[in-house]
Each structure stands twice: as C-alpha cells, then as structure tokens.
UniProtKB/Swiss-Prot annotation:
Positions of the UniProt region annotated as Disordered: 151-190, 204-231, 372-401, 422-497, 557-694, 715-743, 772-899
Function text: RNA-binding protein. Might be involved in alternative splicing regulation through an interaction with G-quartet RNA structure.
Record localization: Nucleus speckle
Keyword Phosphoprotein among UniProt keywords: yes
Record-given protein name: AF4/FMR2 family member 2
Gene that this polypeptide is encoded by: Aff2
Pfam families: AF-4, AF4_int, AFF4_CHD
Record field: compositional bias (Polar residues): 180-189, 374-384, 436-450, 580-590, 887-899
Keyword Phosphoprotein attached: yes
A GO biological-process term: mRNA processing
Amino acid sequence: MDLFDFFRDWDLEQQCHYEQDRSALKKREWERRNQEVQQEEDLFSSGFDLFGEPYKVAEYTNKGDALANRVQNTLGSYDEMKDLLSNHSSQNHLVGIPKNSAPQTPISKSEASFYPEQKNRMIPSHQETTHSSTPMPPPSVVILNSTLIHSNRKSKSEWPRDSHNTSPAQASQTSSQPNKMQTSTQDPPQTRLEDFFVYPAEQPQIGTVEKSNPSSKEENNPNSGGEDTFKEIFQSNSPEESEFTVQAPGSPLVASSLLAPSSGLSVPTFPPGLYCKTSMGQQKPTAYVRPMDGQDQATDISPTLKPSIEFENSFGNLSFGSLLDGKPSAVSSKTKLPKFTILQTSEVSLTSDPSCVEEILRESQHLTPGFTLQKWSDPSSRASTKMLEDDLKLSSDEDDLEPVKTLTTQCTANELYQAVEKAKPKNNPVNPLLATPQSTPATQTNVGSGSSSESESSSESDSDTESSTTDSESNEAPRVATPEPEPPSTNKWQLDKWLNKVTSQNKSFICGQNETPTETISLPPPIIQPVEVQVKVKPNPSQAVAVPKERPLLSLIREKARPRPTQKTPETKALKHKLSTSVDTVSQRTIGKKQPKKVEKNTSFEEFTWPKPNITNSTPKEKGSVELPDPPRSRNKATAHKPVPRKEPRPHVPLATEKKKYRGPGKIVPKSREFIETDSSTSDSNTDQEETLQIKVLPPCITSKSKETSNASLTLSTLTNGNSNNLSTSNEETAFSPPPAMQTELLSPLRDHENPKNLWVKIDLDLLSRVPGQNSVPVTPAKTDYKETASKPKRQTAATAVEKPAPKGKRKHKPAETAEKIPEKKQRLEDNTTICLLPPCISPAPPHKPPSTRENSSRRANRKKEEKLFPPALSPLAEDPPRRRNVSGNNGHFGQDKNISMAGQITSSKPKRSEGKFCATFKGISINEGDAPKKAASATVTVANMALATATATATVPAIVTATVTATATTTATATTTTTTTTISSITPTITSGLMDSSHLEMTSWAALPLLSSSSANVRRPKLTFDDSVHNADFYMQEAKKLKHKADALFEKFGKAVNYADAALSFTECGNAMERDPLEAKSPYTMYSETVELLRYAMRLKNFASPLASDGDKKLAVLCYRCLSLLYLRMFKLKKDHAMKYSRSLMEYFKQNASKVTQIPSPWVGNGKNTPSPVSLNNVSPINSVGNCNNGPVTIPQRIHHMAASHVNITSNVLRGYEHWDMADKLTRDNKEFFGDLDTLMGPLTQHSSMTNLVRYVRQGLCWLRIDAHLL
C-alpha cells in the first residue's frame, strides 16, 4: 500500500462522502476496491510482506511474561493465523482493511469506528484491563460506538461468518467491507485515519462525549479526530501502524475474532491486513454494556462474543490512532501493560472537566471548520466524519441506543456537534467519568483506574483536540506526511510500538490514577477525583493544549519517545500520586519543556497533596533530627549528619537529577519543593543537628551541651562554666563569650544556608577566610582534660567523643562499643565524603602515644590526679607559646596522652564524621579550654565544611578566645609541655578541667601537640588522634575492606594509591590483632604477606622513581617502603623459629652428606682439570647423574628441598626488609622537612618499631599527604 494508493482511495472516500447515496456508492466502491485488492493482493502480500512471520509473537510468548501471554492471546496462534493469512479471501479481508476507512458504507463507517473498537478489542487482549480504565472516558463515545459497534459487531460478526456477505444489509456491508478491507490494504492509512478521526474525536470527546456521545463523537471525529488521528498516526509513527493495527485484528482473527481484535494492535506483524472484516465481524460490538472481563473475552474467538464494554468503549471510543498513541486505550493498556511503561506524554490532557470537555468540543468544533478545512482537503477527515455518521446510522439501525442512532443518523457532523453540545449541558454537570459509568457500569468497575484514565484520556483528547486545533495547520502537513510512516508499519511490528506506547501510558495512567486519588483525596471515587483534578487542572490542560499547539509533529513523536523516559516516572509515582492526576498527565502529555509550567500551575494544588507526603517525609526526617539530639551523640552525628547530606544533594543538584529521573518537571518541581519544604524544616532541625553534630565534632562536652540546648549555638557560658572547672572560669567564660557570638553567627548563617549545604559550607569558608588573620594567632594549648583522658580508655574516649553530649563521667565510662558504633557511622560519613579514609580504630588511637597505651593511660590517670591538685599553677605554666602553636595551623593542641586520648576520642569520632576535612583527628579544632567549646563549635562547623576551614576556623576561634583562654590554657599548657608527655598531660588536666569538659580540648589535641612540646611546637601540620582501644581482627578487616573498596572506586591514581596504603595499614592492624588472638583461624603471617602485596600494588600505581614523580609520590613511596620493611621484618620474626629449625636441619643434612660428597669424584674434576670434561658434564646431567654410580651427584631428598626453599623464603624477608628500609632512607632525603615533622610529631620510626607505631606513623603521614593533595 503506497501513499499514492492511499490518497487515491482517500479521494474516493471523499467522493463517497459527498455522494448522498453513500451506501450504494460505498458498496460500489467496495466492490471496485475488492477487485483491485484481489488484483494487487498477491503483489501486496508478497511485495510488502507486512508481517513476515510472527517472530514478535514468538518473542513475546517465549518470554513467558504476562505481556507475552497477552500478546499471545491477542495475536492468537500463528499456526491458526497462517491459514487465514494464506487464504486470499481472508487476506482480502486482512489486507484490504485500509480501504475500509474512506468509501465504506455506513457499516464501513461504523466499521471505521468499530475498527478502532476492534482494534481496541484486539488490543484489549493485552490491554483489556489496561483499557478498561480507558473505556470509561468515552462513555458517550462508547454509546455511539456501542450503537455503531453493536451494529458493526453484528455486521462484523456476520462478516466473519459470511466473510463478505451475510445479511442483505450486512452483505452489502460485508461485501463492501471486504472490499473496503481489501482496498484498505491499499489504503490502510485511510482506515487508520478515519479510525483516528473517529476515535481521536472520540478521545477528545471522551470527556465530552460522555456528555453528548453521538454528536460529540461524530463532531469530534472530523475535528480533533482528524488532528488526533494525525497526531496519533504520527505518534504511532505511521498510518500503517494504525492500519496494521486495524488490519491485524481482522486477518488472523478469523479463528480468533477477539484475539484478532486484541491482536489488532499486536497482530500487525501478519502480512495480510490483520484488521479484517472477519475479525471485525467476530468482534461483534456488544460489550459496551459489559465490563471488561479481561483477555479471555478478547481472546475468545466466537464472533458472537462481545468484547467487554470497556474494550469497546475504550477502543471503540478511542480512535485507533489514539490507541496507537496509547491515549485513552493506551492509558487503559497502561494498567494492563505496566512492563512497557512508556508514559505517553501526549496522553496527558489535564482537563476532563465537563466545562473542559465542552471547551474541547467547542475547540474541536472550531477545529472542525479550521481543521476540517484542512481535513476536508484530506478526504479521510471528511470520510471519518461522514463515515461516522454512516456508522452512527448503521449503529442506530442495529444498535440499542436509538437516541444516539437518531442523532447520528439525522445529524451531520455539525448537527452532531450541536447535539453533542446539547447533550453536554446535560452531561457536563456530571463528571465524564460518571457519564461513563452510566453508559457502562462495567466501565465503572474499571473506573478506579478507568476514571482517572478516562479523565486523562478525555482531558488528553481535549488537550489533543485543542492542540490539534492549534496544531491542525502545523500538523496538517505532517499528517500528509503521516502516510510515510507506513514503511515502518510494514517493516516494523506495530504491536511492539503500540504496546510500548500503551505501557508507557499505562504507567502514566496508573500513576495518574494513583495521583488522582491522592489529589482528590476528598473524593473517594476515582471518577469524582478525576473530575476535580480536571477542574483544578483545567488551566493546565490549556497549557498542555498550548504546548501541543506549539509543538510540531516531531514534538508529538518526541512525546512518544518521552513516554519511555516517563517510564522512569514509576519511581516518581509517589510524587505523581501527590500531584493531581491531571498534573501528572499534563506533565506526561506536555513536552518536558512545558510540563514545568503546568506543574507550576498545579504546584499549589500539588503542594496541597505534597504537604502530606512531605509531612510524612519531613516528619520522619524532622523526627530523626529532633530525635537525633536525644539519642547518644554518636547517633546524632551519624543520623543527623547523614540526613543532612541527603537533603543537601536533593535541593541542589539532585533536583536536576530528580528532574532527569522524573521526567515530569511538575513532578520534579513538587518534589523539589517537597524536599525544600521538608528540608527547610528538617534542615532547620538538621542545621541545628548539624551544628550540634559539628559541636559534637568539637569536644564531646560541647556537643553534649549543644545538643542539650538542641541549638547549634550552645550555651557556651554554661559549657564554659561546666567545662572550665579548674581553669579560671572568668577567663574561659570571657573566651567563651566571644566564641558564642561567633558560633551563633556561624551557626545562624549555616542554618540559613543549611538547605543548600554547599552554600553552608561556603559560608563557613567565608567565615574562615575572615578568620585567616586570626589564624596567625596560635590556639591555646590542647585542652583535653587530663582526668578525662586518663580515666577514659581510648575506646571510651572515642565513644565519649562520639557521645560528646554526654558528661565527662559518662564519656569516660561510655562503653567502647559506642565509640566503635560512632566510628562506623563516621566512617560511613567518610565514605560519603571520601575524605579521611582512616578506619575508626585509627582515628581513636593517638599516634603520639607510646606503644604502651596502658602505661600512657596510667600516666594520664596520675596526671589527672596531679592536675586536679595543681590546675591553677599549671594554667599559668601553660603559657608556653609553643604549645599554643597550631600543629597544622589548626588550633588543636596535643595534650599528648590525655589530650591525645581525648582528642583521639573526639577526633576519632570527628574524623570519621568529618574525615572529609582532615583525617579523623585532623579536623579536631583545638580551642582554648573555656573557649574550646565555643570555638570548637564554630570551628568544628567550619571544619565540617572544609579541612582548610578547620585550620582557619581553629585559628579564627582561638583568635577570638585566644587572648583569654590562650593566656590561661596556653600558658599552662606550654609550661607543662616543656616536659614531655607527662608535663603536657599535667598541663592538659588544668586546661582540660575546663576545656576537656567541653571536649574541645580533645579537638584541640588533634592539633597535634607532640609528645615533646618543644619539638611538636615546630610541627605546623594537623595531628591525628588514635584510639588505643583494642579491637578484634574482624573489626580491622572490615575497616580495611572499606578503605580498599574506596580505593577501588577511585580513578585518580595518587588518591587510589593513598587509599590502598591506608587499607594496607588496616590489614596490618588486622594481622596484629591476629597475633594477639591465638584463636584466629588465619595466620597473621598470611595477612602480612597479603598486605605486602597490596602495598606493592599501590606503589606500582605511581612511578616514584620517574624524574617526573612529584614530591607526593616520593613521600608516599617512603611511607610504603617503611611499611614494607617493617612488614618483611615482622614476617621474618613470625617465621624465625621455623627458619631456625630449617637451618639446623639443613646444616645437619649437609654435615652428614659432606663426607659422601667428598668421596664421590666431582664431575668438574673428572679429567683432572678445573673445567669439566665433556664426559663429566654428561655425567652431571640430570638424566645421567642419578644413575651414575661412579660420578652420580648426591640426590637431595624432597624434604630437604622444601626446607631449603622455606628457609630461603623466610630469610629473604630480612633482606627485603633492610633493602626497602634503605630505599626509604634515600627517598627521605628529598623531603626531610616532611618526614622531620612526622618524626617530631609521631616519634621516629625504626626497624624495631611495633606494628601499632608503624600504623600510626604511616597513617599520620598519609593524612598529611591527603591534605597536601587536597584529597580530604
């Protein structure tokens, strides 16, 4: 069927329409066409082979999914179809269908409308359930269709029976129809177009047709029908699609009429016009009264079996084009074919409102003149109208709905329109959905889905009509071009396209249905809800209509494509439910560009819905935020911090992503609003939480207090009073007073900007940028309470740090589990931030502490006691400026053991939380005792924002408080720090008494006061605090795996290498734990061996030996070499006993065999010369040597061989260890300052250092490398 034939037939149809004796002329034309078709049948079927073999059917059925079953039911068995396809007579029916569109007798008209119904029916097999919802929209149309369809069904059912002629009327009809169908093969587009015109009109009318079924339908057929038809055709990609769909039902349906109709959409694969009269006859239009029972009826072959009303309604009412477009029928099919969830944006017309329907009908009427002019130029449009009239007449003759008959029989398209308008006022008050139920109670059964789909389809048809009116001109040419899509129909299986469209529509429709109840919550019945939604959304439909007007046919095609993108909308179904159905449909229907507008209009309406979901969403979030302060600080940090990141991304970038995800901008907008609202509320609480969390990141005391106050701004005075027990409260308070202002200032802006956390971070940076001048001011010495540090185990300190809100005593006694939990949470945060990869165990352990942390803790306890006794004197002593100095420019001061332990606790929790900033403890911002809480809070917030920010923030906060607290705390700290850790610890207690309570001291301690205050004073880099708590091997293994997975996910080689090295440290800790626990199943030697391999792999990522290698690469190489060296030495120590045994055994063996060896003449001296003779060489050969009695070499037992190999492997570890150590020494020369600071801060690393010291030393170095490389 080429375009020429199509238009030629179209012209014939037009002439027929102009003929007054249409039935006679149509009959003649049918006969003529039948003859032509018969002549062209062979060529057509062979040349075009429209459907080849039903590979699609097999494909779908093989999948075994519901859709495949539906398709199978729809298409029927191909074997059954073969006969029909092979028969010329059946092929005539199937192939000639396209001609049905134009010159058909009134029966053909009813057929035209019926074809869509059949198509619908055929579609129903898959889509019955899906279309069931759709049928409701066109109840009036259904009535018209029902009349037409009943008549058509009768005639059609008889057609299948008679195949051509059945009853006199039907005989002519059938004869004409076979001809028509045959000719339709030639002119499939015409039938499609007519069907489109009929159903598109019906679709737009669906809302209105319910009100005035016959007239509106007939009227809309020429108007919106034509446009919709074209749109649908375009959407269907070609008239042929519709043709195929039309034909598909007919041809194979001889055996399975309903299947054929259902296969009408799917059957297009069959070469002959599947939409044959026979199938149409089989699809006797009886089911308008019946609810869609499902595919069973559709698949039922008996021609008498009437498809469910919904099928006929949805399909009969819908133009096949609409079916192709997946509009109403697609909507219904959506329900049924969720898999192919291709939401059809075109399907979404917001207004199914009675008034909207009236407007649509009017527009369609207006379209009828304008569009009809265009379409009248297009014979198919006229044919569709007049055919509709004829169909109506036929249906009136045969159908039970006589009022409609009378209207359709007596009324011209204009008259029908007037009648429709008359009917409209009657039905308009009633929801179109209600009208639909009236026409079809069964439809109401599907009304739940159908009502929304109906409203969508009606509104869609309305918008389509409007858009067609506006786009009629623009679309007119495309319609002409529409036939061009035929090749795709011939080449491409139309059922596939249609199903995709329908499925997309189904999803959108389903979403729409859900949304409709959501929006019109007050209206329980989906029908009523759609009406309200439609009414509310009216403006939106107009917008939607406007959009279609503006958009070209390409846009329509795009819309088709969009439905697929909208498939993503299932994810946003919740949002859709929140949005009004109309809104959702509008967004679907409208192209992405204009959807936002519609959404905007609906947003207020949506917001009404949104608040509920938002309330739900926000409520949990807010609850979480509210609860977060209440639960242990560790929880608050993790939970509060986590929710915040979620919210942040959503309002910022995620909104765009969400838009992408949720194609519907409307959906996106409400969602974004929802998030904004929930985020604004939750963000407020989250900001508070975050602030409190940040405060938490600060000393535990501060966080605890801040949480208690549940405001980011803590009552610093209270904190100061509580925290500065030993320090002069006045000084600390004085220091605190400024920090509170800063804190409040920082916090308030943070709160303001918390919704966009990026902004919040930036704000902190700005604050830090202000502070830089203050950064020069060193922060007061570390302020961890010596008592707390000493009393608290490292684990407990970490736990307390996590629980910062808890009091000192509580923190001290908090179980290590809390600390572990907190580190894990923090690590999760770290995973998010991917800043500090330090495992929680690492952060808790202060690197500077001696390997014997127990001794340190005992010392700390003693120091605490001493500090308790001498806090005042110590405070003045702490004046030493070196202690004030920020190790990393951060104010954190290391209270050595106490401060470190506290800092380890706080920082361990903080780093995990804000590892993104500095490595765990790195972000600890040392704040002077009393000031520490306030400063720490503000500084911590800044630190949370940025690692650099932390440095500045610490400097800034101290700058404010430094005068007071620095004078006190720093003086005491420095004085005490003159001594080693003990002095520092004593100083720390004094400062800590006030400062540690605020747990800011811990934060400051991360600032890395070295064991030797004088040496550490020179260090300007941040110091990590490490947890001395002991964990089992599994704990370290999990940490190592996390770090390794992070490294695996990275693409930047340096960052990957650093993370692998960090993971290797955790594996090393795991091996060390295995050594401690004899019950561990895995050998620590194996763990170390695997760790060595990981380190070697990490070193291969960067070629440090290259002249282009950066200092960072060389520094990393040094750290890796140190690790490798100590690991090799450790491996040797683990196997040293075995090596000694092997050595003894080997020595004994060689001694025993020494005499034998001397007795045996050596092959090398067989000829009396130093060089072996050829004979001796031969003797030495492995083959001959063993069997040679005289000169045979001594055979070495396998046992000795293995012992020697093992001995070599073990001893080689020593060689490798020293070799790598030497390499590290060489590379260290290029970065003396870096490693000098590292040695100063962490203590020199030697070949005899413990694995714990190694891990802390290297981890501290890796932290600095991250900072230098901006990886934190």
